[in-house]
Amino acid sequence: MGQARDRVNYSFKRLKEIPEELRPREKLLKLGPENLSDEELLAVILGSGSKGADVLSLSKELIKMGWEELEKKSVEELLKVRGLGLVKALQVKALVELSKRFKGGKSRISIRNPQEAFEFLKDKFDERRESLIALYLDLSNRLLDWEVVAIGNVNTVFSKPKDILFKAVKLSANGIIIAHNHPQGEPSPSNEDLNFTERLKKACELLGFELLDHLILSEGRYFSFREEGVL
């Protein structure tokens, strides 16, 4: 048996103990984000620790809590974490919220007028058949979610108000925009379109939602019920 060797410690507890080239920012620059641990990525975002806690120790403590727990905690509760001051608590809450908004690829974009609704919707339809899409917005007209509510044939699509309102209740939405396409023909409303819109508007009012608009899209153009004074 050879001479006993000093034990090699791969786990550095404090940032200042880590060789400069292996610190989170330097690693990110040299190796890319995919080669950093969760703690290291959070340390890059937080930037520095405090007198009471090194940034890596602080990041490790926060990651250990888990994303769902961080989402639930208020700023006041986060301030109880050793070394986490007000600015960093706000950074954590902002990061969690931003991550939630981008989860699933659905960023919280704003839709404030018919043109913005059209720009969002124009590539969402199958040109071969009619479809009905619903957009669900919050009080600030930010998109909470959207879905294809119904798919029909080349000339018609059938739906009921409850098909749209069920998800609005689930999301606690404030406003709803519906849209459907006319694969063949002009983007102008039929009698069926007018009747359905009126029924949906009344159903929305009963449940405390606002029907913001109904758009009909066809061949790169649109008809807005709100813009034309029909709604």
Swiss-Prot record:
Give the protein family.
Answer: Belongs to the UPF0758 family.
The record's annotation in InterPro entries points to: MPN, RadC_JAB, UPF0758, UPF0758_CS, UPF0758_N
Tell me if Zinc is a UniProt keyword of this record: yes
Pfam families the UniProt entry points to? RadC, UPF0758_N
Specify the species: Aquifex aeolicus (strain VF5)
Q: Which NCBIfam families match?
A: PRK00024.1, radc
This protein is called what?
UPF0758 protein aq_1610
Note the PANTHER family from the entry: DNA REPAIR PROTEIN RADC, UPF0758 PROTEIN YEES-RELATED
Indicate which residues form the motif JAMM motif. 180-193
* Presence of the UniProt keyword Transmembrane in the record: no
A molecular-function term among this protein's GO annotations? metallopeptidase activity
**An example of a Gene Ontology BP annotation on this entry?**
proteolysis
What are the record keywords, sorted?
Answer: Hydrolase, Metal-binding, Metalloprotease, Protease, Zinc
